[in-house]
Amino acid sequence: MKKRIASVLVALVMVLSLVPKTSWAWTSTVTTLEQLKSAMSELSYNNTIEIVVSGTIEISETLNIRPTRTTNGSMAWYEYYNQRVVISGADANSKLVRAEGFKGSLFNLTGEQGYSGAGGSDHPAYAALTLKDITVDGGGDKTTATNPAIYVSRYGTLTLEDGAVLRNCKSQYYAGGAVGLFAGTSEFVMNGTARMEDNEADYGGGVPEGHHRGRRRRQDDCHKS
C-alpha cells in the first residue's frame, strides 16, 4: 500500500513538473493606490499579473512596469522576467484618475535589454500593460501634464481592450496627451470597443501622428477631439 501511494505521488509530481510556468496568472482586487502599486510590482516569473480595480483610485505618482532580473542578475550574464500587467474594472464605476497637480505620466512601460553568454546575445524582456473595462481619466480639466498619461518606451506594449476608455489627457511639450511611443520597439494596440476621447497635446491628442517611433494598430483619435 505504501509503495502504491509513493508511486502515485511520484507520478503527480512528474505531471505537475510538465505544466509550464508561463501559463499561470493570479488576480488581485485593489481599492487604493498603495495596493495597486504593490500588485503591479509582484515578481511575475513571466506570468500575467491580473488586477481588478474597485471604485476610483487617484494616481499621484508614476507607476512603473518593468521586467525584473532573474536569479542570474548578479552574474556577468543575465536575463529578465517579462512583466505583463492586466488592469480591469470591477464594474462600470471603476476608474483610475490623475490626482490634481500631478504632472508626470500615470504609467511608464520600459522593457530591458538583457545579455547572455560570452558573445553577448540579446535577450530582451517586455513590459506590457493591458486595460479593459475601465476608464483612465488624465484629469486634463484640472491639470495640464508635462508627460503623456502612458509612456511606452523600449520593448513596451500598451493594449486597450473592450470597455477601456482613455480620456481627458492634456499634456504640454511631449507628443501625445494620452499615449507616447518613444522607441522603435514600443507598440500601442486598440481592440474592440476601446476608445480614446478628449485628449490634447502639442503633437497629437491621443497618440501623435508622425512624431513617434513605435508601432500603432487601429488609428483612432490621433488629434484633439
Task: Locate predicted features.
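Hydrophobic beta-strand segments of well-ordered beta-sheets in folded domains
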Residues: W26, N47-G55, Q83-V86, L129
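Positively charged n-region of N-terminal signal peptides that target proteins for export
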Residues: M1-I5, L9
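Bacterial N-terminal signal peptides
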Residues: V10-S17
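Beta-strand-rich solenoid/repeat architectures in extracellular/passenger domains
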Residues: I87, D91-K103, L129-T146, E161-A175, ...
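Acidic Gly/Asp/Thr-rich repetitive segments characteristic of extracellular carbohydrate-active
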Residues: W26-V52
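Sec-dependent signal peptide cleavage junction
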Residues: L18-S28
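Extracellular beta-strand-rich solenoid/capping regions of secreted or surface-exposed proteins
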Residues: E58-V86, L96-K132, G138-L158, Q172-Y173, ...
